[in-house]
Amino acid sequence: MKIVLAESLGFCYGVNRAVEATKRLLKEKRDARVIGDIVHNEIVMKKLKDMGLKVYPDLSSIDFSDTAENSVAIIRAHGASPDVEDFLKRRFGYVVDLTCPIVYNVFSLAKDLEKKGYFIVIFGKKDHAEVKALCGRLNDYLIVEPGYDFETIKAFLREKKPKKVALISQTTMNSESFEKLAEKLLKLEGIEVSVNNTICNVTINREKMAIHLAQTCDAVVVVGGKRSSNTGKLAKIVESHGKRAFHVQNPEQLPDLSIYRKVGIISGTSTPKEQILKILDYIKFTYEGEVIRNGGEV
């Protein structure tokens, strides 16, 4: 079996920055708390919790009865709405903002466009943390999720009657789907449309790698958390190109791969390299695989 590694694997800059900063706080014995997962990777989150990180699903679930002088609130890589930020600053003496710089740039762009009179259309998932943080900064907006009905969007805009519309995206969405939505919006009559592709370049490059692996391999192993938007997207891209994609977090989740002569390996941007290495080693030793690095290193 030949095992082909994607050119880029592991954490992106924003995720690595957030994880390493959280580890430093925990090593300093800070009482670190966060609303939601730092990253959407179950293995990474278990390690951080084992180090002492306290994770709460929402603001109302935070227990303030045991806060101490060394307590610190963390704003995760996806960002937080201004209301949440203000609340944390009031209740904690120290707040560490680990919002990904690329995500923060999207927040700033959206606010600037709104100030210029644009009605904001967001291509993203309404329950995703990044989208929630973005919406908390805007006065009015429309979220367009995958699988949208464009006639419904047209009807909404006819009723809303905006003169100008600005399209932006959650940073981890599928770039091809974004472009298709942009193309449809640009055809609307009587509305000035500004298209702003705010999808992260790292995720766009991973999409291209997923397509390349699907075109050159018999199957592709996609390594990453089950709740990771960008990891799940890679698996869907592979399958859309007619190849089997196995979205796994550990070797135990892999099926029998003996029927495949060439298997690709790619990861989401919230997947640590040690997680990828475990799966690579398992495939290599189980199937006597030859690793083709293709520029990729683990």
Swiss-Prot record:
Pfam family, one: LYTB
Catalysed reactions, semicolon-separated: isopentenyl diphosphate + 2 oxidized [2Fe-2S]-[ferredoxin] + H2O = (2E)-4-hydroxy-3-methylbut-2-enyl diphosphate + 2 reduced [2Fe-2S]-[ferredoxin] + 2 H(+); dimethylallyl diphosphate + 2 oxidized [2Fe-2S]-[ferredoxin] + H2O = (2E)-4-hydroxy-3-methylbut-2-enyl diphosphate + 2 reduced [2Fe-2S]-[ferredoxin] + 2 H(+)
Pathway per the UniProt entry: Isoprenoid biosynthesis; dimethylallyl diphosphate biosynthesis; dimethylallyl diphosphate from (2E)-4-hydroxy-3-methylbutenyl diphosphate: step 1/1; Isoprenoid biosynthesis; isopentenyl diphosphate biosynthesis via DXP pathway; isopentenyl diphosphate from 1-deoxy-D-xylulose 5-phosphate: step 6/6
Binding site for dimethylallyl diphosphate: H40, H78, H128, S228, S229, N230, S270
Cofactor(s) recorded in Swiss-Prot or TrEMBL: [4Fe-4S] cluster
GO terms, biological process: dimethylallyl diphosphate biosynthetic process; isopentenyl diphosphate biosynthetic process, methylerythritol 4-phosphate pathway; terpenoid biosynthetic process
Enzyme Commission code(s) on record: 1.17.7.4
Gene3D superfamilies: 3.40.50.11270, 4-hydroxy-3-methylbut-2-enyl diphosphate reductase, catalytic domain
InterPro entries: LytB/IspH
Residues at the active site: E130
CDD domains, A to Z: lytB_ispH
Domain of life: Bacteria
Positions bound to (2E)-4-hydroxy-3-methylbut-2-enyl diphosphate: H40, H78, H128, T171, S228, S229, N230, S270
UniProt cross-references to HAMAP family, sorted A to Z: IspH
Record-given protein name: 4-hydroxy-3-methylbut-2-enyl diphosphate reductase
Gene name linked to the record: ispH
